[in-house]
C-alpha cells in the first residue's frame, strides 16, 4: 500500500525531517531530480532503497544550469504525477524547494569544475551547464547530508563531474551510478523525450543503434577513426544534427587513442528537430 511521502519545502523543514531520521541512526540515500519522473528515475529510487535505510528525492528544476535560449520555462513539470510515483515506491521524503529557497537574495557562490572530464563534450556546447550542476549538487549534498547519492549513467559526463567534485571537496557522499533505462526500442529514457514528434520518435533510437555498432567494432579491434566516421554518417543520415560522437576514457573522460588500455566510453549528443538527445555506452 502506497503512502504519500513527507514533503519539505523550506530548509528548516528539511533539517527537522532529516534530524528525525538521523536520530534513529538511519542511513540516507539522495536521488537528485528535476521532476517529470519516468521509469529511469524510478530505477534510481529502487537502487537508493537497496543502499540505504531511508530515501530522499529532491525535485528542483535548477535555473542556473539552463542558458537563456534553453527550455527552462517549458521543461516538463508534473508535480502530482511525481508524488504519486514516489508514493508507490514508498519514498520517505521529498525535498522540493523553490528558487528563492535554493538561491536566496545575496547568493553569489558558484562552483566551476575543471579537469579532463570537462574536455569538449557537453561543456563545449553548454558552457554554463556544469557550473550550475556542480553548485546545485553541492548544495543538495550540504542540505541533505546523504550517505550515498544515486545518479543515472545516461548523463554520464555529469556523473563523472559530480563524482570528482565529491571526492575533491571531501563531501563525504558516495556517488553511485545507475545504468541507463531504455525504451523497448533502445531510446534512453529522458524527460525531454516528450518533445519529440511522432516522426522524430521513430528516428530517435538510431542513436543507440549507432552506439552499439560502434562499440561492437571497437571490441572486435576495428579502427577507431573508421568506426567513428561510419557512426557519424549513420546518425546524420537519419536526420540528426550531430554535436559530438567521441570515445573517451570511462573514468576520466580524457580523449583516448586506438591503442590505449583501460575502460572506454562512447558518448553522443545530437539534435533532431528542436530536441537534443544524449546517450552513451561502454566499450
UniProtKB/Swiss-Prot annotation:
The gene is panC. GO terms for molecular function: ATP binding; pantoate-beta-alanine ligase activity. Beta-alanine binds at residue 65. Belongs to the pantothenate synthetase family. One of its GO terms (biological process) is pantothenate biosynthetic process. Keywords: ATP-binding, Cytoplasm, Ligase, Nucleotide-binding, Pantothenate biosynthesis. It is an enzyme of class 6 (ligase). The active site is at residue 41. Homodimer. This is Pantothenate synthetase. It comes from Bradyrhizobium sp. (strain BTAi1 / ATCC BAA-1182). Coiled coil: none annotated. CDD domains: PanC (cd00560). The reaction proceeds by a bi uni uni bi ping pong mechanism. It comes from the Bacteria. GO terms for cellular component: cytosol. Its EC number is 6.3.2.1.
